[in-house]
């Protein structure tokens, strides 16, 4: 098992090499919106998992997840060759591509926060005109005054 720090360094290097190759060297149009977000290398340095996101061509267009996955699978051999040449390790790790779900989870969290803000605003509007259900001081007994003169309520 390799040093965890070495595995992290190798993962970062692999991520940089693959991202650069996708952007500048591989000419598949399905990879135009693909971004490598993270990489993890196994403890024995034989397997590398690369996480990616896909952006649409425009803000209104949905990303092509299937096309990007197929293009990454097709380019896996070329990318592994580039990783081997760029890292200089004895055994070039096998590459596995996994779609990153963090942006989807972040979008879902933003929706939940927006819903909570809207509920808070509705509650603030309802509270604005509301009055107490009973007397302003519900603990005061009508007509009973404090006879000992203390303000703390202690009768010693």
UniProtKB/Swiss-Prot annotation:
Residues 125-138 have a biased composition (Basic and acidic residues). Keywords: Cytoplasm, Ribosome biogenesis. Its main location: cytoplasm. InterPro entries: KH_dom-like_a/b, RbfA, RbfA_dom_sf, Ribosome-bd_factorA_CS. GO terms for molecular function: ribosomal small subunit binding. PROSITE patterns: RBFA (PS01319). GO terms for cellular component: cytosol. The keyword Calcium does not apply. Residues 125-156 are annotated as: Disordered. Monomer. Binds 30S ribosomal subunits, but not 50S ribosomal subunits or 70S ribosomes. NCBIfam families: rbfA. One of several proteins that assist in the late maturation steps of the functional core of the 30S ribosomal subunit. Associates with free 30S ribosomal subunits (but not with 30S subunits that are part of 70S ribosomes or polysomes). Required for efficient processing of 16S rRNA. May interact with the 5'-terminal helix region of 16S rRNA. Belongs to the RbfA family. This is Ribosome-binding factor A. It comes from Mycolicibacterium smegmatis (strain ATCC 700084 / mc(2)155) (Mycobacterium smegmatis).
